[in-house]
Each structure stands twice: as C-alpha cells, then as structure tokens.
Amino acid sequence: MNTEATHDQNEAQTTGVRLRNAREQLGLSQQAVAERLCLKVSTVRDIEEDKAPSDLASTFLRGYIRSYARLVHVPEEELLPGLEKQAPLRAAKVAPMQSFSLGKRRKKRDGWLMSFTWLVLFVVVGLTGAWWWQNHKAQQEEITTMADQSTAELNADKDSGQSVPLDTSAATSQDTTPAQTAPAPATPVDSTAATQNTVVAPSQANVDTAATSAAPAATETPSALPTSQAGVAAPAADPNALVMNFTADCWLEVTDATGKKLFSGMQRKDGNLNLTGQAPYKLKIGAPAAVQIQYQGKPVDLSRFIRTNQVARLTLNAEPTPAQ
C-alpha cells in the first residue's frame, strides 16, 4: 500500500517539482546544478518551474531534463510520461539556407561592380587615346600647312629675285663714283711738276693729267673695301640679335614686333640663322628638339615643348641692358 501511494504521489508531482525536491535532498543549489550541467541558472529555474522557453527547442529541453535527472539520481523512466506532457516533440522549423543564397547574391553584385569598373576604365582609356590622336593629328596638319606656306613663299621669292642684279649693279656704280672723284685734288701737283721739267703741248698735258688722275683712283679703290665689309658685319653686333643653330631639319617662322616676318621656311641640319629685328620676337617652331636658340647672349629654354612633343609658340621679350 505504501509503495502504491508513493507511486501515485510521484505521478501527481510534475517533472520540475520532482527535480527540485531531489536537488534539495542532495543539498545542491541551482547555481551548482547550472555549473555542472553547463547551463544558465535561468534555464535550471525554468525547468523546475515547468516552463518551456519559447526560444529553446523541445529536443534540447528534453535533453536538459534527462541530464538534470541523472545528476539528482531520479530514474528517467519515471519522468518520461511527464516529459511527453510537458515538452511534446514539435516539428522543428527549418530556416531556409540564407548563407548560400546571400553569398550568391553578393558574388553576383560583385561581378556587376567589377564589370562596371572595367567598363569605366575602358571608356577613360578610349577617351584619352582619342584626345591624344586628335591633338597629334592637328599638330601634323598644322606643320604640313606651315610647310606648304613656306614653300609658297620660297617660290614667290625665287620669282621676284630676278631683279636683284639690277640693284647690285647700281650699288656698285654708286660705290665706284666716290673713288674716282676722290683723287681729283692731286692733278695740280702733277701738272705743275710736268711744266717745270719740260714744256709739252696742251694735248699731251691733258693725257698725262688723265693718266695720273686714273692711277690714284686705282690705288684708292681698294681702301674703300674694308669700310663696306665693316658695314656688312655691323648688324651681327646687335644686342637683340637672335641666333639659332639647327641639329636636324626644322620648320621655323620668326616675326618681330612690327609684324614683319624675319624668316619663314625650312632650315636644314647643321644650319645657322642670325636674325635682327625689333623685339619682342614671336617664334613658331615645328620641331623644338632640333633647334638651339640664343637671345641676348642667353640660351632659350625649350624643354617644356620638347617633353610634350608639340609645336613651340613663344615670345621673346627684350631685357633692358645695364647702363655702362
């Protein structure tokens, strides 16, 4: 009778109450049970109060209760009927696989981003190449145009250069006239000497006088040559002279302050060019790397045009010379 009463009493008790009573008989606290079972104290308390946490699956809850029963020496067979009522098996809700789909979406997004990046890069490279080609083509067309203009100007100069010998002959006649008139004062000396020595006919005296006047003229003519040569070399000493040396073939155009073209055409390799005009000078150089320029005794820096390989357009201003 006592055994049946005890069995009925145990069945009347819930699972949580039986576990709590067994724990108290062993003198264990909830903290000690939680530490031995590696559970939270709140979980042990919920089990003793017959509470099923909503965030805890029934399978885990049944496992915790069985571990608790073994710890406090309560037979598991006696707790099975109560477990079925307290924690019935519920179908676990299987969450859809998020990680794979998320990784797939992320990979797809990264693929679009990479494709867009490459597209932008190709567009930038294409625009840069098109810009460079347009500039290069424009420079080549400009150089060709300038070369054609210089060729036309050279042909025009050749056509108009046939009248040059007439000017030179006039200049030579002007140069020889002073030379012939210069020794005229020497004739009275010669004529007086002739009259003192012998008496000659008037016709012979005129012949001698003409001969003596021609001789000093012949001797005086060479003395006029150095002065004309000095006059030709004088412009080279101009402080505003522009001196250019060419290391390769180069097209060039030089204009002074008055708008006069001092030079426009092609210069060959190892050529030299000295120009004098009114400063400032405006220069247009087709190949800056092929020319070395000196202005007022100082070299002109063309490195910025050489680096970019462009047609050089620059203006050379005159610097004031120090007072002596």
Swiss-Prot record:
Its main location: membrane. Gene3D superfamilies: lambda repressor-like DNA-binding domains. The keyword Ribosomal protein does not apply. One of its GO terms (molecular function) is DNA binding. One of its GO terms (cellular component) is plasma membrane. Residues 155-191, 211-231 are annotated as: Disordered. Residues 1-111 are cytoplasmic. It comes from the Bacteria. The keyword RNA-binding does not apply. Keywords: Cell inner membrane, Cell membrane, Cell shape, DNA-binding, Membrane, Signal-anchor, Transmembrane, Transmembrane helix. GO terms for biological process: regulation of cell shape. It is found in: Cell inner membrane. It is a single-pass type II membrane protein. NCBIfam families: PRK10856.1. Belongs to the RodZ family. PANTHER family: CYTOSKELETON PROTEIN RODZ, PTHR34475. Cytoskeletal protein that is involved in cell-shape control through regulation of the length of the long axis. This is Cytoskeleton protein RodZ. It comes from Salmonella typhi. The lineage of its organism: Bacteria, Pseudomonadati, Pseudomonadota, Gammaproteobacteria, Enterobacterales. The gene is rodZ.
